[in-house]
Amino acid sequence: MEPRGEKSGEADGVRVTPQLLKARSGEFALESILLLKLRGLGLVGLGCLGDCLGLEWLDLSGNALTQLGPLASLRQLAVLNVADNRLTGLEPLAACENLQCLNAAGNLLAGPAQLQCLAGLRGLERLRLRDPLARLSNPLCASPCYWASVRELLPGLKVLDGERVSGRGSDFYQLCRDLDSSLSPDPGAPGPRPMEAQPWVEPGYWEALPPRSSSILEEACRQFQDTLQECHDLDRQAWDSLAQAMRALSPAGATAASFVF
């Protein structure tokens, strides 16, 4: 899915001001801001954002931005999220020499030429141009050679669209891509039609079974009641025997009051 359609026009949009930046960050000076989250504010311009010279982490996703000019002065910026905007180019990011992670999914980047500006960023290791879970993409992602062209343009990437392309674990992702390619049907290739899916179990397998007879439980209860009655009888007999023994051992003329228990 491409980025959202018509957003509010620039006349109705929000622009970045010093007051907005200080309120969102809690800092008193723009140079002191290290982390800034401006997601989903309807921003149409970045205003004085370029004055935040110490900024290292920035989230501008879900706005209506068409250009990133002020970001060219952010030399300390390491993590940038500009997903779900209206960007057709990323040229100002060429000056962000410390950029390591970039999310630009859900914009209007038409081809690899729009990524050429990132080729000089030696520290860029993570790039996202499409996000299937969020249904965000770019026009260039529809090209059959998208993956290969990005890899060729940015050989230093370790993770592309959430998949590791180099380093530990990259072989696994490559194997998954190869399997997907081999299993993808070719419309022009002849071959047998796939078999119709069949149920795994017989009809009625999941239906509730009729209740079983409770004769075993009833017999167990009856035996328990009989045993309990025998215990009561034995208890009564024991008390009778004890009373007889006490009477036999008591001296002549002694009364019940003479026994202390």
UniProtKB/Swiss-Prot annotation:
One GO CC term, this protein: cytoplasm
InterPro entries: Leu-rich_rpt, LRR_dom_sf
Keyword terms of this UniProt record: Leucine-rich repeat, Repeat
Keyword Repeat: yes
LRRCT domain ranges (all copies): 138-183
Disulfide-linked positions: none
One Pfam family per UniProt: LRR_1
LRR repeats: 54-75, 76-97, 98-119
Domain of life: Eukaryota
UniProt record, GO biological process: outer dynein arm assembly
Protein's recorded name: Leucine-rich repeat-containing protein 61
Organism: Bos taurus
Lineage, highest ranks first: Eukaryota, Metazoa, Chordata, Craniata, Vertebrata
